[in-house]
């Protein structure tokens, strides 16, 4: 089987890094097209031996990109097209159908209750998504929670397949030597209580809650923020206003897989932490929380379908917290005073092993390739309405 993956961009983000990890485990010849921003993940894919093409799309309404994408698909001789993220799903599914490819799969990585990929949901966004969804054969939800959201939109249940995000368990396994080396490299005191936060620095992630919580914790507590984005300067100002700027470390965007760039990779940073916080009130999956669990960390979160969709006993040291600095400060103070537990990987993290996700996705591919040709139907009025 030969597959083409179409994604909106390849900067450092959860969906982008998930695609790179998946391609390492899929027994499929795969190429990648990025509509925009061939960033660090594009470089990583090329290093992995994947052919990456930058379409050079100027914006959401750059209709001239559509015929370029159609020509690229036709020339590639692909058996299947797999799209990722909103813009790539809308343009990619249409281009694939025009190019004559009928086996089309799309993954919905980032659908919240009121936003998608950090943007507010509108009737127009839903309507366009549903119209393009009919052009494919399967829509992959990264969690049962996302599946329910898609069904409420009007996507028929039989068209939705749940394939959770996956992680490389061995890569995130706790390593005490790596912890010591990473703390020394970052200038973190060896005996400091280090709170971790991982993700895009956008307003919706609510990392400001974690920053303000630090003002209520003892001076030996640090906040290690891993990620980049438009809210970094806002968070720095918030830290200064709260009087904790000297105890907050911005590590920037860090690769999932070591790529030779200066600075530790994401698993090393996880080893350096004592607890992970996720103050985001809307998540489609909660990949950072699962990665933290794989490293044996306690997790305190506001929304995390990856944890909530599993039995309660799957992970012992996880707690749901309200999105409030005082609530986070209180639960972090409890973690700080408890004797440290062995950093073992719980069942919840093992449930999301990347090889398991790759196997499930291959089943979706097989079904999409074998399915009979059907004409796309118009989206229902129910699906288009807010």
PLM regions and their residue ranges:
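Aromatic "clamp/platform" in nucleotide-sugar-dependent glycosyltransferases that forms part
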Residues: 281
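Nucleotide-activated donor-binding/catalytic signature segment of Leloir-type glycosyltransferases, i.e.
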Residues: 236-260
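A conserved mid-protein helix/loop that constitutes part of the nucleotide-sugar donor-binding site
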Residues: 13-21, 193, 197-216, 230-236
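Conserved acidic donor-binding segment of nucleotide-sugar-dependent glycosyltransferases
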Residues: 313-326, 334-337
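Carbohydrate-associated surface elements
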Residues: 145, 166
């Amino acid at each position: 089987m030969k597959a083409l993956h179409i994604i909106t961009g390849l900067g450092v983000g959860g969906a982008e890094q998930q695609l790179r990890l998946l391609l390492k485990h899929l027994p499929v010849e795969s190429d990648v097209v990025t509509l925009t921003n061939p960033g660090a993940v594009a470089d990583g894919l090329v290093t992995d031996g994947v052919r990456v093409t930058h379409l050079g799309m100027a914006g959401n309404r750059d209709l001239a990109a559509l015929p370029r994408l159609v020509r690229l698909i036709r020339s590639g001789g692909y058996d299947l097209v797999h799209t990722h993220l909103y813009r790539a799903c809308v343009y990619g599914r249409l281009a694939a159908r025009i190019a004559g490819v009928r086996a089309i799969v799309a993954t919905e990585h980032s659908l919240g209750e009121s936003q998608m990929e950090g943007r507010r949901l509108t009737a127009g966004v839903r309507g366009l998504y549903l119209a393009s969804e009919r052009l494919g054969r399967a829509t992959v939800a990264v969690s049962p929670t996302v599946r329910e959201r898609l069904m409420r939109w009007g996507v028929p249940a039989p068209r939705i397949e749940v394939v959770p995000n996956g992680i490389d368990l061995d890569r995130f396994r706790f390593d005490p030597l790596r912890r010591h080396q990473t703390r020394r490299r970052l200038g973190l005191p060896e005996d400091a209580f280090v709170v971790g936060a991982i993700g895009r620095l956008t307003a919706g992630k609510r990392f400001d809650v974690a920053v303000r919580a630090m003002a209520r914790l003892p001076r030996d507590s640090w906040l290690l923020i891993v990620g980049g984005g438009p809210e970094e300067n806002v968070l720095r100002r918030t830290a200064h206003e709260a009087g904790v700027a000297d105890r907050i470390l911005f590590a920037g965007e860090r690769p999932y897989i070591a790529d030779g760039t200066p600075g530790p990779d994401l698993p090393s940073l996880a080893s350096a932490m004592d607890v992970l916080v996720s103050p985001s009130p809307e998540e489609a999956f909660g990949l950072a929380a699962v990665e933290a669990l794989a490293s044996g960390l306690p997790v305190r979160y506001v929304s995390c379908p990856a944890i909530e969709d599993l039995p309660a006993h799957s992970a012992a040291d996880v707690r749901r917290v309200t999105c409030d600095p005082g609530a986070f400060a209180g639960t972090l103070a409890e973690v700080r005073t408890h004797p440290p537990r062995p950093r073992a990987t719980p069942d919840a993290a093992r449930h999301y092993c990347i090889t398991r996700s790759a196997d499930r996705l291959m089943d979706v591919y097989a079904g999409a390739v074998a399915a009979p040709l059907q004409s796309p139907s118009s989206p229902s009025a129910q699906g288009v309405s807010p």
